[in-house]
Amino acid sequence: MARYCGPKNRIARRFGANIFGRGRNPLLRKPNPPGQHGMQRKKKSDYGLQLEEKQKLKACYGMILEKQLVKAYKEVVNKQGNVAQMFLEKFECRLDSIVYRLGFAKTIFAAQQLVSHGHVLVNGKKVDRRSFFVRPGMQISLKEKSKRLAIVTESLENKDQSSLPAYLSLDKAAFKGELVVAPELDQIASQLPLPVNVSVICEFLSHRT
């Protein structure tokens, strides 16, 4: 399935939340779902609910692709432990997600650009693959020149240290952060802009693999 390239505000209105963390909340101007019949809420089937939860998760992590969901599920489904937690961890510990959570970027899309354009270092080495899986103990920092980027300095200035997830550490002065421990399911859920039923998504994906 191709990556969504349409208006991001339309996605925010669909789910009724400023899902991408934009400074100007799109719901203030148009609070209703998009479309001619946006106000009419039809009762969804179980399949429809599964699709909606899947789309919510994709949006929360910057419109990730269907094949990335399937791949993540295949990697965890046969492992011991909480499948839902391990599945969600695959996205929360992506490099672009960690860059966003640390406050180096105001939105997940800005974080994706920082990574793709080669501004981000992992353990001192450049990594430009935004899906790179960050493991506990890895340090995330920025290139020296990148520390002066306006999108970085403005974002960090507005970053409230108290909002930093417990599984991360941040040294604002050094533009450096670290994934201290693997995040728990409830910790990840608290960082998402809207509730997502991960178990329903895993059930849906179980029929696709």
From Swiss-Prot:
GO CC, any one term: small ribosomal subunit
UniProt cross-references to SMART domains, sorted A to Z: Ribosomal_S4, S4
InterPro entries reported in the protein's UniProt record: Ribosomal_uS4 (IPR022801), Ribosomal_uS4_bac-type (IPR005709), Ribosomal_uS4_N (IPR001912), S4_RNA-bd (IPR002942), S4_RNA-bd_sf (IPR036986)
Gene Ontology process terms (BP): ribosomal small subunit biogenesis; translation
Entry-linked Pfam families: Ribosomal_S4, S4
GO MF annotations, alphabetized: rRNA binding; structural constituent of ribosome
Entry keyword set: Ribonucleoprotein, Ribosomal protein, RNA-binding, rRNA-binding
Annotated region described as Disordered, given as residue ranges: 22-45
PROSITE patterns in alphabetical order: S4
Entry annotated with the keyword Coiled coil: no
S4 RNA-binding domain ranges (all copies): 93-154
Stored HAMAP family: Ribosomal_uS4_B
Family annotation (NCBIfam families): PRK05327.1, rpsD_bact
Subunit architecture: Part of the 30S ribosomal subunit. Contacts protein S5. The interaction surface between S4 and S5 is involved in control of translational fidelity.
Function text: One of the primary rRNA binding proteins, it binds directly to 16S rRNA where it nucleates assembly of the body of the 30S subunit.
Family affiliation: Belongs to the universal ribosomal protein uS4 family.
Stated name of the protein: Small ribosomal subunit protein uS4
Gene it is expressed from: rpsD
